[in-house]
């Protein structure tokens, strides 16, 4: 396919138009008085959001060169989201400011490589200063403040703080859609996995449509059970003990399932069968987790064990098991604390080594289930559109809170970026390097300026006053007052601010050193189909 190539000034100008289009759509959402953006969806209702990365990912421009510029800035938002989980709008605003300011200087004759060095020096100094002024997060109230600022909702802040108090800082907190209008916190005690009963005839409570087993034995295997003879020896031993039985297997089907159901209905014994959770290697790991939690063994041919040789000693035990149509919850497993702790340590080690985001998520889930108790924030809203928007905000707030726990907090509302201004301005440099430092200084003002503009105020006035204020004092755009940001609970995670600045500078430096841009030439439109209107059908009468 033929290519279009643009060079130097023309190339950068084309890409800048794309940068501005995307950044202008994203930056209207910044701050407590930021607006929303409506995104069209091919199916279902449109999505209304103020989440920077969600907006950035949706934007696709017709002009190939402009689109490349837009995609570069979308990359800033996406990378910041991956690392810190929030701060995507701030990152976009910083990137746009650095690119615009840098481009003016390149046009005026500055050397892009010199500018790049200056930008890198300035950002390194700013990040060092951010580390110095950040404060460790302490107590439930600080966590609630960080979450409330990110979600723009105090109630959500309290829910997240409560959830984190229960599971610790690196515990798993899941989000689910509620069937009601309210958002609430629900804690699932014990280990829960998403597999329900193999047959509805196994339920013990017909009102709640669930099976409840008290002090059951638990048979754990990765085999498919289709012949009752395979498990008959262990079944007889369990019946003699007079205890219910939970069977976790790859599948229970055919004659085996029919026999279990018939005996359950006759009252011969109380048994519930469920499929094993997960797939492949993850299934094996989860079965091993359940075995360790309940003090049982996984009966698998890999270890030379078969079902016929299983005894009650190889079965797990738990205080209670609740099985619904969709979930199984094992409460009060009797596994040894030492073995559970060792397993948790093993999963933590895997977490540190993994590079896959999906694997990390699954390992964290396993960790939380073993530790016992998974908080679920059930998000409620009046409409589906509002529900999607709330869910995105709460997701951001969760990520933001975790980031705050990792690297501490700094003054929010763009104030911390202005607090490092003096440190960056004091760097000694000459020529284009000094110009690069000035580009970063100009960009550091931009988030505060944009927050003030979104609140209907004159941005430059707020920026100039902030330069003369003490560290930590800033402008509360929600009330229009000048306050101590940390004391007022207007805080940002240091990790979010750091990531936004680093990623914005990285893309801006790449942009300014671009000298040629190559894109596919648009394909000519296919010729229209000829008009068929004149073709009569009279000559086809003989075919009737």
From Swiss-Prot:
The biological process GO terms on file are: chaperone cofactor-dependent protein refolding; protein refolding; response to heat
UniProt keyword terms in alphabetical order: ATP-binding, Chaperone, Cytoplasm, Isomerase, Nucleotide-binding
Cite the EC number.
5.6.1.7
| Domain of life of the organism encoding this protein | Bacteria
**Annotated compartments:** Cytoplasm
Mind telling me which PROSITE patterns this protein's record contains? CHAPERONINS_CPN60
Q: Which residues form a coiled coil?
A: none
Binding residues for ATP, per the UniProt record? 29-32, 86-90, 413, 476-478, 492
Which NCBIfam families has this protein been placed in? GroEL, PRK00013.1, PRK12849.1, PRK12850.1, PRK12851.1
Q: Which family does it belong to?
A: Belongs to the chaperonin (HSP60) family.
Q: What is this protein called?
A: Chaperonin GroEL
Which organism was this protein described from? Answer: Bacillus cereus (strain ATCC 14579 / DSM 31 / CCUG 7414 / JCM 2152 / NBRC 15305 / NCIMB 9373 / NCTC 2599 / NRRL B-3711)
Name of the gene encoding the protein in the UniProt record: groEL
């Amino acid at each position: 396919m033929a290519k279009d190539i643009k060079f130097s000034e023309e190339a950068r100008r084309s890409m800048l138009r794309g940068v501005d289009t995307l950044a202008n759509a994203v930056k209207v959402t910044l701050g407590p008085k930021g607006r929303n953006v409506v995104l069209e969806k091919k199916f279902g209702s449109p999505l209304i959001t103020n989440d920077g990365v969600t907006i950035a990912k949706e934007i696709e421009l017709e002009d190939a060169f402009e689109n490349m510029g837009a995609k570069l800035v979308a990359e800033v938002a996406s990378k910041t989201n991956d690392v810190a989980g929030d701060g995507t709008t701030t990152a976009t605003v910083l990137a746009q400011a650095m690119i615009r300011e840098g481009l003016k200087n390149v046009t005026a004759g500055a050397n892009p490589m010199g500018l790049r060095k200056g930008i890198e020096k300035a950002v390194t100094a700013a990040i060092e200063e951010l580390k110095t002024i950040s404060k460790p997060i302490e107590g439930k109230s600080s966590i609630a403040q960080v979450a409330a600022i990110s979600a723009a909702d105090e109630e959500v802040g309290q829910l997240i703080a409560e959830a984190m108090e229960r599971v610790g800082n690196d515990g798993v907190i899941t989000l689910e859609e509620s069937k009601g209008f309210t958002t609430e916190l629900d804690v699932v005690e014990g280990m829960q996995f998403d597999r329900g009963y193999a047959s509805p005839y196994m339920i013990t409570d017909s009102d709640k449509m669930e099976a409840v087993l008290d002090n059951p034995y638990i048979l754990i295997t990765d085999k498919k059970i289709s012949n009752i003879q395979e498990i008959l020896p262990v079944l007889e031993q369990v019946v003699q003990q007079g205890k219910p039985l939970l069977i976790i297997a790859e599948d229970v089907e055919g004659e085996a399932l029919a026999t279990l159901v018939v005996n359950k209905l006759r009252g011969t014994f109380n048994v519930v069968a469920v499929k094993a959770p997960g797939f492949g290697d993850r299934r094996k790991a989860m079965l091993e987790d359940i075995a360790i939690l309940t003090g049982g063994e996984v009966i698998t041919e890999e270890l030379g064990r078969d079902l016929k040789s299983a005894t009650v000693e190889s079965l797990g035990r738990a205080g209670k098991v609740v099985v619904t149509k969709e979930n199984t919850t094992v409460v009060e497993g009797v596994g040894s604390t030492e073995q559970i702790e060792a397993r948790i340590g093993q999963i933590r080690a895997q977490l540190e080594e993994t590079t896959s985001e999906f694997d990390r998520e699954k390992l964290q889930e396993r960790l939380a289930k073993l530790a016992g108790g998974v908080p679920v924030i059930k998000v409620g809203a009046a409409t589906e559109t509002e529900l999607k928007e709330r869910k995105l905000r709460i997701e951001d707030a969760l990520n933001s809170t975790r980031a705050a726990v990792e690297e501490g907090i700094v003054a929010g509302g763009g104030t911390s970026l202005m607090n490092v201004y003096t440190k960056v301005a004091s760097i000694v440099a000459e020529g284009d390097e000094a110009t690069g430092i000035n580009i970063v200084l100009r960009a550091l003002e931009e988030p505060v300026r944009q927050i003030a503009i979104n609140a209907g105020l004159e941005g430059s006035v707020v920026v100039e006053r902030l330069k003369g204020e003490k560290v930590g004092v800033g402008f509360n755009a929600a009330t229009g007052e000048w306050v101590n940001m940390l004391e007022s609970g207007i805080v940002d995670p240091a990790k979010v601010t750091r990531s936004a600045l680093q990623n914005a500078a990285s893309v801006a430096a790449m942009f300014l050193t671009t000298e040629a841009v190559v894109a596919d030439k648009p394909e000519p439109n296919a010729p229209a189909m000829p008009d068929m209107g004149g073709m009569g059908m009279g000559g086809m009468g003989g075919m009737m």
